[in-house]
Amino acid sequence: MLIGHFTEQPWQDDNSGLMGTQSTDLSISNEHYNPNVGAHLYNRYLDEKVYAEEMGFDALMLNEHHSTPFCMQGVTNVGASILARITNKAKIIILGNVLPIWDDPLWLAEQLAMIDMISHGRLVSGFVRGGGRESYAHNSPPHFNRERFEEAHDFIIKAWSDPGPFRWEGKHYHYRYVNPWARPLQQPHPPIWIPSTVSVETVKWTAAHRYPLVLLATKLEPTKEAFQLYHDTAAELGYESGTQNVAYLWKVHVDETEEKAEEVGRKYLSGVSNPFLAGNEGQVNPAIMNLPGHTSVSYTHLTLPTKA
């Protein structure tokens, strides 16, 4: 079993007056942002990752979101590249780069290859489709989200694995000359993980590629169903999957004593900081999260409505 350290790296500033805000996506002006506080938080979160490695965590996990204070990391590759240099043992797991918003996946392939080399082969590269927030904020057409995800994935794998130069003429990406000088240390490429929240298509696609499926704080019963769908798909494709093929993001609060941890944890679950309470839209306005064309009819929104 691999245990990793993960946090959304949220904005924290009591003077911002954002506690209890109904929605934290695209509706809060960045006039509330204080660069001095931001500078402190970015360095603090990096220090936490270094400490997590010292405490024995197997992996340091990073993600990215855009135009929202609940996740300060808008460019996950920046944090990953810093950790590649200042840590020594732990895997660096990106959960993950939002492929559909990248207009230049060759540039992404080069960045990730550099991170893998600087870390001496510790990179695990996660790829995600992203939510409606990312498409909305970066002017990416939601109805082509899955197509762009799959084509960008195929291109990056080829750029990492096949000798160049070669030409790429796809539906969404076109290159006259592909010959990245930066190639990953791990050959033919770093491990790929696929985080999801979850859709039938994504589960089956992930199983078909034999990538680990990472479910992000989804309800337990649908999580079991999704994992079983993965295992069933693997069996249909002729291989036996196991615990090495699935992962789960679990929320944990640690404090000085068990009693204090439970007290603070319950305040989080039942207080204004819980984005899923009745009358609260949550981190994402549903109208933005589920943009037309972004999700299929098979999609079930499984993000955990946490209860005390």
Task: Annotate each predicted stretch with a short phrase.
Residues 83, 115, 156, 192, ...:
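Conserved, mostly hydrophobic/aromatic
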Residues 82-88, 116-122, 207-208, 238-239:
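Acidic (Asp/Glu)-rich catalytic clusters
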Residues 201-207, 226, 243-283:
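Aromatic-lined glycan-binding groove of carbohydrate-active enzymes
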Residues 1-87, 190, 301:
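N-terminal beta1-alpha1-beta2 module of alpha/beta enzyme domains
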Residues 74, 78, 221-226:
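Active-site-adjacent beta->alpha loops and helix N-cap segments on the catalytic face
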Residues 3-5, 60-62, 92-94, 123-125, ...:
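Hydrophobic faces of well-ordered beta-strands that scaffold small-molecule active sites
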Residues 300-306:
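Conserved small/polar residues in nucleotide/adenosyl-binding loops
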Residues 2-38, 101-167, 212-215, 219-221, ...:
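Flexible, glycine-rich active-site loops centered on histidine and acidic residues
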